Amino acid sequence: MFTFDDKEFEFKFSIGRIELIEQVTEMPTLSNINRTGGLLSIKDLKTYFAYALKEANSDVFFPIKKGMEMCERMIEEQGYEVVCSLVLEALQRDCPFFFQGV
């Protein structure tokens, strides 16, 4: 969970969300992480961020376009590494099957 513009947000990844992300990035998630050493391209980072973003305690996902804009602002204000770490930590938490035996 993290705070941005005085609101609480969280990421929620699932197999269904990953399928959507992989359609957009045209790259399997594990291949993307391995290929980049976990340092996703800005385009891919914005995609993972936006497709998994929810306001805290909400049942619905945040609008994707607004999520991409938020990601861009956070990268500019807090730094790429901070944002990438938030996304990867949530991915590890929600989809541990990607990281078994690694």
How would you describe each model-predicted region?
Residues 52, 56-60:
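Amphipathic alpha-helical interaction segments
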Residues 14:
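Residue-level signal for threonine
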Residues 49:
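A residue-level signal for conserved active-site and pocket-lining positions in enzyme catalytic cores
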Residues 1-5, 19, 23-43, 59-102:
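Charged interaction scaffolds used for protein-protein
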